[in-house]
Each structure stands twice: as structure tokens, then as C-alpha cells.
């Protein structure tokens, strides 16, 4: 089973999304649980996400008609996943420059 860790950018993204949801009266806990469940699936299926640029992968996390995207890297030798960033599908892009 792959180990999962979060970059400081991904943690900041979760906080930003949480703040947005709570300010707009949306169910923050339900959304964060949904993201957590999707990321946990990657422990058993680390290549589940679609290929992205620079050898990275994107996990699409559906929530009704919309959802979220988690950008991550997977290191086969270490069996380790690093979640680099998380955004809403309607956002134009990730909020930080990703190497």
C-alpha cells in the first residue's frame, strides 16, 4: 500500500477550499471527507489518476455535476504518493507553480 503525504501547497489548498465552502454555507465536512476518501483510494491504486504534464497525475474527484482535482506524483521505488495541489474543477488552474 502506497504512503500518502501532502505538500504545504496541498494543505493550503484544502484550507482555502474549506474557507470558501464555509463562507458560502456549503457542507465543508462532507466535501473534505469526499476528498479524503478519494485520496485514500490511491493507497491501493496509485496510478488511478490520469496522466498530466511532467510525469504527474491528476485524480478527478466527482461531486454531483462538478468536483475537485488533486495533482500528485507517485514514486514507484518508494511506493509513495505526494499530493501537490488540490483545486475545484471550475478553477482555471492550480494556485501554485508545480515543478
Set out the residue ranges of the language-model regions.
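GIY-YIG nuclease signature motif recognition
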Residues: 10, 35, 72
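Amphipathic, hydrophobic secondary-structure cores in small proteins
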Residues: 32, 56-59, 69
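Enriched for short, Lys/Arg-rich terminal
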Residues: 22, 29, 63-99
